[in-house]
């Protein structure tokens, strides 16, 4: 079989302007970037008032190093729905260069279920992530500069010379890190302001851009005005009295928003069979809320009969945050969920680690790992929507094990179960899955959130841990206990919680496989994201700046004299 890159290069692409017109966009609603991609102007939101489509959210079992094929299934299902004569659109996140050059690789799908050209999607796209980085770092430069000048001049002289209010920033009161779109562990904790005339020194650090609150704001905003208002609420620092200093207080919110004026527009590309795909925003699902943008979904639902999107990692991560953060804030309600699994994933979740063992038939291990799939089925079903299991088939899978798994799923809360072979067969590989999903979308459902807005903040943490993960409870560090009191006293207890934890286990501990029980979720820190509209709970050892592994992905990537990039897929 050809490589992903070769398949992408051989694709018969539609001119993006023609594809956009078929999708229902007017010429002045598209800002073209050559013939392969276009920004979609938000005026289409006003022109089309009603959402007409069914929203399908794709999630997965607990992820493993072997890859479950969630994006492959998202794109493949989109292609199959189109092949059945439906007007359909996929909505996915923009890939971060951290995973592209790290361990995961690209995020365009794979095989014959791809968004193309895949190299353009995986590297830069239309520059949205760079715009987020630039806007974020402008905020960091602005608050550091303000601290420098206020310290240098004092209150009276500062106000006299600048005409601005003295913010009285507390020593070590700056909360706003800098960001970069790479995995770079040495930047996690740094000292800034060192040296003469460089400002008061303070401890800071870098996060990956996907963890920036600005990225979450981009993904959750309804329009440009909403994004501007949210950016104004960003908490950059605290003053000596402990009060928050916002981007609006600093006077930098407008400039930060201006840097993201084009980033607020989704990017239109296409699948291998010419279905439209909107790519927008890129928050990670382990350290952020892990879903593409509200704006992209809104536009797609106004133009398509079916919209297929995905949440990052397993249903305890991106799907949970789709429901309790994205859907809560936007009012979007999915019609059905597709839960991706593989024989390999179930065996890995039983405790097997070697490729040889996982690829070999092993009925006992498959049955042991099935508990993880059943947990995820029940986890999705508790939100009140039908769940369809998609078994992503690999060449090493045996018919006997696949048939056993299909039969086992029939005894669960799942609406249906189908094989998916879109990686090798493209649109033909998920026709049965597409038909089952269409039937599921017609079922009566009552989408339900896990907890109400007015639940106490500590109770939200307990509910997420005990109901959302099956934990025995939550423990808060001394710092988290103080932060809990502060956030409640300041009136932020109504916000939803974004758990930042490992994706490699339903629990907080990546070593606990299958369906862990009896564990306590350790919350070490609570972080207010006032602009994004949620509180992040940092759990266990999760990091907001990843590091490169022993054998990073960049080792495979190169470019020839002809300009052709190799090694992305």
From Swiss-Prot:
The protein's matches in HAMAP family, at most eight in alphabetical order, are given as: FTHFS
E.C. code: 6.3.4.3
Task: List the protein's name.
Answer: Formate--tetrahydrofolate ligase
What's a single GO MF annotation on this record?
A: ATP binding
Q: Which UniProt keywords apply?
A: ATP-binding, Ligase, Nucleotide-binding, One-carbon metabolism
For whether the record's keyword set contains Ligase, the answer is yes
Task: Give the family, as the similarity comment puts it.
Answer: Belongs to the formate--tetrahydrofolate ligase family.
Record-annotated residues binding ATP? 64-71
Q: Which GO terms describe its biological process?
A: tetrahydrofolate interconversion
Question: Is the Nucleotide-binding keyword given for this protein?
Answer: yes
Give the pathway annotation. One-carbon metabolism; tetrahydrofolate interconversion
Catalysed conversion reaction: (6S)-5,6,7,8-tetrahydrofolate + formate + ATP = (6R)-10-formyltetrahydrofolate + ADP + phosphate
